[in-house]
Amino acid sequence: MNKLIRFGVSLGRDLLGRFDTLIAERGYASRSEAFRDLIRGSLVEEEWRKGGEVAGAITLVYDHHKKDLVNRLTDLQHDVHDLIISTQHIHLDHDHCLEIIAVRGRAAEVRQLADSLRSVKGVLQGTVNMASTGKKLG
């Protein structure tokens, strides 16, 4: 781990009060830890924006009774198997499934996969959760 460096941040009283409330609600041990998380979050967003190597999760909710839906989703995943680290399939009820697809690759390729999966008829919801490979977060 890198050596920690102290520096000052100037904030308005109201903004600091709201930040302190957020810190308490989320259970951070200190302002510093919360601030580090905010910085890391911004760095992850920037990695995704610049199109570098990223990690993340694509989540899908779908009705598995829709004709050919499961086969179509599987085919799309096999077409880019090098992006997919792992998948988890969860039965929400008799009709609906949740699929979580862990991915790693170039941001544009991950977005394209997510868009392809979300656009399949029968997919009720699809989201992409951005994460980092951790290589640039220090």
Question: At which residue positions do the language-model features occur?
Answer:
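Short Lys/Arg-rich basic patches
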Residues: 1-10
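Short amphipathic alpha-helical segments
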Residues: 9-11, 19, 29-40
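Short, charge-rich, low-complexity interaction segments located
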Residues: 35, 44-51
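Short glycine-/aliphatic-rich beta-strand segments at the starts of folded cytosolic domains
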Residues: 52-64, 98-100
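Short amphipathic alpha-helix segments
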Residues: 64-84
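Helix N-cap motif at beta-to-alpha junctions
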Residues: 65-66, 103-110
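Short amphipathic alpha-helices in soluble, non-transmembrane regions
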Residues: 71-76, 112-120
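Conserved short beta-strand edge segments in small beta-sheet-based binding/regulatory domains
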Residues: 82-90, 115, 119-134
